[in-house]
Regions:
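Short beta->alpha connector loops
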Residues: 10-13, 28-34
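Substrate-binding clefts and catalytic carboxylate motifs of secreted carbohydrate-active enzymes
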Residues: 3-8, 18-20, 34-205
Length: 205
């Protein structure tokens, strides 16, 4: 072969069932909790987060009260921009950051995604192929129940995964990554906007 081979693996068992042996560099999709054991069991093999985060948000949308449950925060085809929300198989950015810092032998991460894109509008996606992201059992049953609940309503057309939206405008999440990846760059990002007359006298996190 003329080049190294890698793969992004959704199935956590791929590292143990022989598939991992076919790869030069092992890629994990949404499995930050697996890094520690992988490094211990396979110290000879480099690894990285091949597809990470999948946090969802709409630029400039803030819903109250703030719900810290990662499966909440969406309403009327928008997702609150506090960057607390993600599908069941995915994570907030700080979860992956912590896993990368705790496992310095990881080669890093590829975030899903840099930009929003047309299609795959999770959490409003009516496409049952979403179920492929989770193993069979209670987690998949929960996902299918959510799809059924959405019913035949017209889905949103665009994804919410991007760090930057379809127009190229930075979401709040952009600054989370900038602060983490560019510690040399002094910055502060305050959200939501501070002149919000409708919320006068209310706590706005």
């Amino acid at each position: 072969p003329t080049r190294k081979v890698t793969s992004g693996c959704n199935n956590a068992n791929a590292a143990r069932n022989g598939f991992g042996d076919t790869l030069d560099v092992y890629g994990y999709n949404y499995k930050p909790w697996a890094y520690k054991d992988f490094a211990k069991d396979r110290p000879h093999q480099p690894f990285y987060g091949a597809e990470t985060a999948s946090c969802v948000s709409s630029r400039g949308e803030y819903f109250f009260p703030v719900d810290w449950n990662k499966g909440k925060g969406f309403y009327l085809y928008q997702v609150s921009s506090y960057d607390l929300y993600a599908p069941g198989w995915a994570n907030r950015p700080d979860v992956e950051f912590a896993a990368q810092e705790d496992n310095p032998n990881s080669a890093g991460e590829y975030v899903w995604t840099g930009f929003d894109y047309i299609g795959e509008p999770t959490p409003y996606n009516l496409d049952a192929t979403n179920a492929l992201n989770v193993p069979e059992g209670p987690e998949r049953e929960k996902l299918m129940a959510e799809l059924k609940k959405l019913g035949d309503r017209a889905p949103s057309r665009s994804s919410y995964f991007g760090i930057v939206d379809l127009c190229g405008f930075k979401k709040d999440r952009f600054y989370i990554y900038q602060a983490h990846w560019r510690p040399d760059l002094k910055m502060a990002h305050i959200l939501p906007h501070w002149n919000w007359p409708e919320r006068k006298g209310q706590v706005t996190p």
